[in-house]
Design a protein with these regions (language model features):
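Flexible loop/hinge segments at secondary-structure junctions
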Residues: 1-241
Length: 241
């Protein structure tokens, strides 16, 4: 997304200029401003360029685990994870810091043994007593940025894990570790659905799945395009110079 935004604005730091730049997020305030006519004026690169942004598709950012592994068995037994539980899983913030940000950690991780290590068994005594490991896109990715906004609410940092702009690297990390969890676009999950499970997500940002009144919804073409896969359905943009 950063490359698409930069190249359509002829920002040489992002690569060769292009007439059409794809993005999986909206424009940042630091990149462009929207005028009264709905067009965006570039703030970096060639600032004389104006760009028209078009929604061309919808994508469901898919949270995935190794099919049949410990993480899959845990999450399947829970019926999915809430958005709040995803935040707890991926955040480097302590439980105390997350509580101060409005999360009910006793609902999110009711079996937490307070050892400072986030384990699947913290979510339920029926889950494996194994540390949760992470695999997710790098910070230059629009997918990373969308997850940071939709799930992390732009608070704190991600916990350490395997980070890569290459989804193949993430798939290898996920399938090589039954305790790993990660995320990327739905199309890439579809390519690997024989070896990965896309989990159901409840759009509750304060409590765990057991206490969330919102239904957990798994990504599919119908739930993504129909708007029920929230908060992880997102528009895909084409920006035309």
């Amino acid at each position: 997304s950063g490359a698409g935004a930069g190249r359509v604005c002829a920002n040489s730091e992002k690569g060769t200029p292009v007439d059409i730049g794809d993005m999986s997020r909206g424009w940042k305030d630091s990149e462009a401003t929207m005028g009264d006519n709905g067009q965006y004026s570039c703030l970096k690169g060639d600032t004389s360029i104006t760009v028209t942004q078009l929604v061309v598709a919808f994508d469901g950012l898919s949270v995935v685990v190794k099919q049949g592994g410990a993480a899959d068995q845990c999450i399947s037994g829970l019926g999915g994870l809430s958005a709040a539980q995803l935040r707890w899983v991926f955040s480097a913030n302590t439980s105390a810091e997350l509580s101060a940000q409005g999360l009910d950690v006793s609902s999110i991780a009711p079996n937490d043994d307070q050892d400072g290590v986030r384990e699947w068994s913290d979510l339920s005594a029926d889950c494996a007593d194994s540390a949760i490991t992470l695999a997710y896109p790098d910070a230059d990715s629009g997918t990373y940025e969308y997850f940071y906004e939709a799930i992390m609410h732009e608070h704190g940092a991600f916990a350490s894990g395997e980070q890569s702009a290459d989804d193949n690297v993430l798939v290898t990390a996920l399938t090589g570790d039954e305790n790993a969890i990660g995320y990327f676009g739905y199309a890439y999950y579809q390519e690997n659905q024989a070896i990965l499970t896309a989990i159901a997500v409840s759009d509750n940002h304060t409590h765990g799945i057991a206490d969330a009144p919102e239904d957990a919804v798994a990504p599919s073409p119908a739930t993504v395009s129909g708007g029920t896969y929230t908060p992880l359905a997102r528009p895909i943009f084409m920006n035309v110079n």
